[in-house]
Regions:
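N-terminal Rossmann NAD(P)H-binding glycine-rich loop of SDR-like oxidoreductase domains
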Residues: 15, 23
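Rossmann-fold cofactor-recognition segment
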Residues: 44-57
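Conserved NAD(P)H cofactor-binding loop of Rossmann-fold oxidoreductase domains
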Residues: 79-84
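Substrate-binding pocket helix/loop in short-chain dehydrogenase/reductase
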Residues: 87-88, 95-97
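Active-site helix of classical SDR
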Residues: 111, 147-150
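Residue(s) in the substrate-gating loop at a strand-loop-helix junction
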Residues: 131
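SDR active-site lid
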Residues: 164-233
């Protein structure tokens, strides 16, 4: 059991990528960390619980396991997610639903499991990991962009719902990061000929940007430090160029925004 001053934090998707780096950074900050993922890749000082975030019963059971060991849950960081790419026309409904089941509804399931306890304890911090793709709508990564836009909109609204109970909600919009996310992406170039080779060119550009992206360990520390804030903001964007891009996309008319993103990825 964690001490009175030790923060108890749940991290989803903690077996790899941003989730793993965040769990490691939280541990270094002195937190008691519980990592929810399907794979158990041991990490010193971090407790793994086998959880598929698309299984609501499993999520609830895992949260109850944490509560059996601890007297509190200070924060939850929802990192679990994956990406698909391809033309909307050639993406099956099953693939599209799977993208939302993990990226959006998985986040919702974890938050639903912890919110009653946080509300009763009168405090807590929910951190949902989104993407600048939520505002820079990337062609041939349409369902990923849409799932992250859903996470961002959900976070803004939830923040107002739970604010009276001392619960903070933060959404972190990330840019390109060099992790295994690129290799794990479910890619499809079906219809590339019909689309004039644009699908393969767009995916190639995405992969290049990701492989030359930000250091995941630095991003893990960035997210872990947000948990330490007494008055966290509702939204953070990591990286100067992504802050600029996010602001630009929010200020520009839709047509101008579309032309810029289309030149980069279309």
């Amino acid at each position: 059991m964690a001490g009175e001053t030790t923060k108890v934090v749940i991290v989803t998707g903690g077996s790899s990528g941003i989730g793993r780096c965040t769990a490691s950074a939280l541990k270094e900050n002195g937190c008691s960390v519980y990592e929810f993922s399907r794979r158990n890749i041991p990490m010193d000082g971090v407790t793994h619980l086998s959880v598929d975030v698309t299984d609501e019963d499993a999520v609830h059971a895992a949260v109850q396991q944490v509560l059996q060991k601890e007297t509190k849950i200070d924060a939850v960081i929802n990192c679990a997610g994956f990406g698909i790419s391809g033309a909307v026309e050639f993406t099956s409904m099953e693939q599209a639903k799977a993208q939302f089941d993990v990226n959006f509804f998985g986040t919702v399931a974890v938050n639903k499991a912890v919110l009653p306890f946080m509300r009763r304890q009168g405090k807590g911090h929910i951190v949902n990991i989104s993407s600048v793709a939520a505002v820079a709508h990337i062609p041939f990564q349409t369902f990923y962009s849409a799932s992250k836009a859903a996470v961002s909109s959900y976070s803004y609204a939830l923040a107002n719902e739970v604010k009276p109970y001392g619960i903070h909600v933060t959404v972190v919009e990330l840019g390109d990061i060099c992790t295994g996310f690129t290799k794990a992406r479910q890619k499809s170039i079906l219809g590339d000929a019909e689309y004039g080779g644009r699908i393969s060119r767009s995916v190639s550009q995405m992969e290049h940007d990701e492989q030359n992206g930000m250091d995941p360990a630095a991003i893990g520390r960035y997210i872990a430090d947000i948990v330490e804030k007494t008055k966290p903001a509702v939204v953070y964007v990591a990286g100067a160029q992504y802050k600029f891009l996010s602001l630009l996309c929010k200020l520009l008319p839709a047509a101008a925004r579309g032309r810029i993103v289309g030149k980069l990825y279309g």
